[in-house]
Amino acid sequence: MKKAFLPPIAVLEAILTFSLWNSRAMTASTDRWRNQLQQADALMQAESWPDTAAALSKSYEDWAQCQTWLHIVSEHDAVDDAEAMYRRAMAFAAARESSELRAELADLRDQLRLLAEMERFSIKNVL
């Protein structure tokens, strides 16, 4: 009788372990991207436009490397929205639109925070 419960318990344990790992990995990744965007914002405020564009490009490349994982574990709309925000931010940096870029970077950092929050292992997200 007890042996019958072992496979379902093992499956539940594997799901819990993956959920905890995914939550930590998502938080670490989004924190890294948000820090990169904060650095780009600081460079923009210093009016170092080539460095701003390079920092955004580097952050976008880092983001792009995680697209497969993000589309597997996150809501597609949230990931697609962040993707569009990255592209708009890079366009604003290329055009040297400081006020538009600043607003877009703030929105993008908030979107990344929400991505991490959606994947956080919590009662709110479980229910």
What name fits each language-model region?
Residues 1-42, 54-127:
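C-terminal-biased regions
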